[in-house]
Amino acid sequence: DSNCMYKCTRNFYEEPVNIRNTKLIAAQNGYDTVIGEINAGTADGKKVAVVGAGPAGIASAYFLARAGASVTVFEKEEKAGGVIRYVIPGFRISDDAIDKDVSFIQKMGVEIKTGTEVKSVQELKAQGYDAVIVATGANKPGTLKLEKGETINALKFLRDFKATDGKVALGKNVVVIGGGNTAMDTARAAKRTEGVEHVYLVYRRTKRYMPAAEDELLEVLEEGVEFKELLSPVSLENGKLLCKKMELGSMDASGRAGVTETGETEEVLADTVIVAVGEKVPTEFYEANGIAVNERGKARINDKTMETSAEGVYVVGDGARGAATIVEAIRDAQVAAKAILGHDIVKGQPVPGTEKDCYSKKAILKESKDAANESERCLTCNKVCENCVDVCPNRANISIKVPGMAMNQVIHVDYMCNECGNCKSFCPYASAPYKDKFTLFASEADMADSTNDGFAVINPETKECKVRLLGQISDCKADDANDKLYEGLRRLICAVIDDYSYLIMK
């Protein structure tokens, strides 16, 4: 499943909406119709250069062109597509699918200059570009030095595998070292390579702590790759890889169990050892262009804009955060595009469904049958999400109607909460509602014992309250339009006092 499916609210009823397959069907069946309707957005005068035509670069160009910017993409390879075209195996995605993505941005007026390597962002600025987006990826191979014997890098192998259609000389026994998604692609490609009989996936932790997606690992195992956990490679000699046996230890800074040596060793048959660990970002490019980097060599960026220390220069995708997913690259591209444009990509996008439609789907079981009908199972939690209300055993999170507001608002009632954490566990966002929701306190004393933003009603008749907002406590009269409190919060407090007075402790 994709990350969005792990967070899908449908999980609480039966199984998630099959978002991944639904999007695939939409892309495959809708292309011919959509491509004919695509046009560039209304020109807004912005001129932007994008360095790199991988997923992050293509997404950046798409969002900018859709909003009317003039965009030129510079790509050092002969074709656009980045690692997806040159590294990701064809059994994962076809060149035809990549070509279709590229055709979208070309139809929107984006110019793509292939075979063109950019070394200076200042030269681009001198050519009149208002902003430069660097989307060069994490294409610097990670290394793992053995005491004896040589290894080959996974990115090089995958590139050779794709270029030769699997005719790479590896021998009969191949060991892939690593636990990420790149290691999974490498193992599957090695299994398909001419002359290979056995592929072993060696990882120093257990399956539980692998960074690879669960479905990626399952595919590897289903295809016959042999998984060997708790092994750390030492040396390659005479067709055998000597490994130290490891055991799990205490948790490290990443939240995964650390490993310690047991003192034992194990040998794994290996004619070739492929290392799929730690692809790195192109630090040298950043430094040469005056872009500040952190201790790991990644560009220092403003997370809200993706802008670097060099004014008007943005870094997106793997080049900003290290090897990650295409979805994360697209997110970065959208953030950077909005920052450059100074507004949303498309204004006034309609939200499908009414509030009644959203509520009517709750608590109705609807099992997945086929991807074409999955949209009927969607609970539209991007519009109405009240999981924290539904799962609280004490009913401490309450949905209330606020006059003048289109949607219900959720408040947290402090004195009804025992901090069980249920709402945090079920929240599809990175939130803990019992801490983050605007909170109704029974008294000033209770407010003093908490750090939550919220309010305590001092006098219901005069609507006098104590309010904490952004950590600052102040007195207010909720029905006073001249009060300095935000209009929305005044309305919410008035709704509690007028329509939900049973919540106020006398």
Language-model regions, residue ranges each:
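Iron-sulfur cluster-binding cysteine motifs and their immediate structural context
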Residues: 1-26, 72, 79, 144-145, ...
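Ferredoxin-like iron-sulfur electron-transfer modules
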Residues: 1-2, 34-49, 85-86, 114-117, ...
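Fe-S ferredoxin-like electron-transfer domains
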Residues: 1-72, 76-77, 84-91, 134, ...
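Beta1-alpha1 glycine-rich phosphate/pyrophosphate-binding loop at the start
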Residues: 16-20, 46-117, 141-147, 185-230, ...
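Glycine-rich dinucleotide-binding loop and its adjacent helix/turn
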Residues: 27-42, 100-120, 141-194, 294-304, ...
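Short hydrophobic core segments
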Residues: 129-137, 177, 270-277
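FAD-site-proximal beta/loop scaffold in flavoenzymes
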Residues: 149-171, 251-323
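A conserved FAD-binding loop/helix module that cradles the flavin
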Residues: 316-344
